[in-house]
Design a protein with these regions (language model features):
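C-terminal effector modules of nucleic-acid-centric enzymes and ribosome-associated factors
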Residues: 3, 9, 18, 150-153, ...
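P-loop NTPase switch module centered on the Walker A-proximal segment
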Residues: 5-97, 109
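Residue-level "contact hotspot" at macromolecular interaction interfaces
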Residues: 21, 66, 105, 247, ...
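Residue-level signature of catalytic and energy-coupling elements of molecular machines
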Residues: 23, 29, 48, 70, ...
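Alpha-helical scaffold elements adjacent to nucleotide-binding pockets in ATP/GTP-utilizing enzyme cores
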Residues: 29-33, 44-47, 101, 125-132, ...
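G-domain G4 guanine-recognition motif of GTPases
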Residues: 48, 117-118, 142-159, 180-196, ...
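Conserved Switch II/interswitch segment of TRAFAC-class P-loop GTPases
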Residues: 85-87, 92-97, 107-130, 137-159
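Conserved catalytic-core segments of large NTP-driven translation/proteostasis enzymes
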Residues: 166-324
């Protein structure tokens, strides 16, 4: 007999993020989702109901500054489950000055819900969030046209907004948008179907979240194992870290990058247990058949199949996160998987600087070779950060783009 939690486990975990312009109702939608899916604890429900009608946004607006201003500033993470699936949800800010937080929340998401106020339609920040989702290659994009109750649940309003947004998303290269008319405050089409929009025949938000395919565990993704620690034990070397993608098996021929040395996987250990195979997301230790000079920051990849690129020239799309601008000629640290190297900004496309929350393209030159994949192919080894070499502050988030 299948229990709700075991069923949720079988369906896999979906990582999702919310985004949209300020006051479009993101936190209220998340609160409604948690409330109506019975994912709210009794003490939480009592806390948000003290003034009468529950203020659902308080389920996610946890910071004092957020509560005082009535906005979401930081990224609020929520973990919940239904009988069909587990979820990790990032509720991200809407203000343009907090675009950097939206990048953080959506960078690991497999689905992003972008909210639009039905009264305002698609606005500049809506387009910015759609561009970020496209930049990050988020596999699934949902448009939630919110506050439909304030426009009389008119189908024409929903249709016009959905058409405009879908056309823009198509220009960005997004293959498909799922548009859903909702009222987060009233609960229409969040968990339960709306009684006010019988003209809509699609899924509710929760129905879509429970059934959308999780592509992160695609079996054909090449294995990538960034080495985090080297452990010496009983005259053998073991390499520890988290498998970023794909599957590693005992007996697999592997290449150590960037050195190019080759060997074979002799043993794998996950959580103290010897295994024949390890899968993406698992923390493991690996022993090779040969004693090679492998260090933290090296990357193990199969000797057969698509190989990562070993290069000192990195091109990529970026979102600048720091208050201080990023300029041509600036010296930075590039952090990629478990490796950090010195780098210099060689050029910026169509600009001489990027300021906070700007989107752009950068060309970097690193002091040492970096082992990288195209972000569109393998997100985990295609993402990078630029850091301030003086204090380690994060400056920029980037997505590597390799020559085709």
């Amino acid at each position: 007999m299948s229990t709700p939690m075991s069923s949720a486990t079988e369906a896999g975990t979906l990582r999702l993020a919310t985004a949209g312009s300020v006051d479009d109702g993101k936190s209220t939608l998340v609160g409604r989702l948690l409330h109506d899916s019975k994912s709210v604890l009794a003490d939480q429900l009592e806390s948000i109901s003290r003034t009468g009608t529950p203020d659902l946004a308080l389920l996610t607006d946890g910071l004092r500054a957020e509560r005082e201003q009535g906005i979401t500033i930081d990224v609020a993470y929520r973990y919940f489950a239904t009988p069909r699936r587990r979820f990790i949800l990032a509720d991200t800010p809407g203000h343009v000055q907090y675009t950097r937080n939206m990048v953080t929340g959506a960078s690991t998401a497999e689905l992003t819900i972008i909210l639009v106020d039905a009264r305002n339609g698609v606005v500049e920040q809506t387009r910015r969030h759609a561009a970020i989702a496209a930049l990050l290659r988020v596999p699934h994009l949902v448009l939630a046209v919110n506050k439909m109750d304030l426009v009389g649940y008119e189908e024409a309003v929903f249709a016009a907004t959905a058409e405009e947004f879908t056309a823009y998303a198509t220009e960005l290269g997004v293959p498909r948008v799922t548009a859903i008319p909702v009222s987060a405050l009233a609960g229409d089409n969040i968990v339960d179907p709306s009684a006010h929009m019988d003209w809509y025949g699609g899924p509710t938000v929760l129905e879509h979240l429970e059934t959308v395919p999780v592509a992160a565990a695609a079996p054909d993704t090449p294995a990538r194992f960034p080495v985090q620690y080297v452990i010496r034990h009983d005259e053998s070397r073991y390499y520890a870290g988290q498998l970023a993608s794909g599957t590693l098996r005992v007996g697999d021929p592997i290449t150590v990058h960037p050195s190019g040395r080759t060997s074979t996987i002799a043993a794998l250990d996950v959580l103290g247990t010897a295994v024949d195979a390890a899968r993406a997301g698992e923390s493991l230790t690996a022993r090779l058949a040969d004693e090679l000079d492998v260090a933290r920051g090296d990357l193990l990849a199969p000797s057969t199949g698509p190989a990562p690129s070993v290069t000192r020239d990195i091109r990529g799309a970026v979102c600048h996160l720091a208050d201080e601008p990023l300029v041509v000629g600036q010296r930075v640290l590039l952090r990629h998987t478990t490796r950090t190297v010195k780098a210099i900004v060689r050029s910026l496309a169509d600009a001489d600087r990027l300021t906070a929350n700007d989107l752009g393209h950068v060309v970097l030159r690193t002091a040492e070779p970096v082992v990288v994949d195209d972000y569109a192919e393998i997100r985990w080894t295609g993402a990078f950060l630029l850091l301030d070499p003086a204090d380690g502050t994060t400056l920029t988030a980037g997505m590597a783009e390799l020559p085709r």
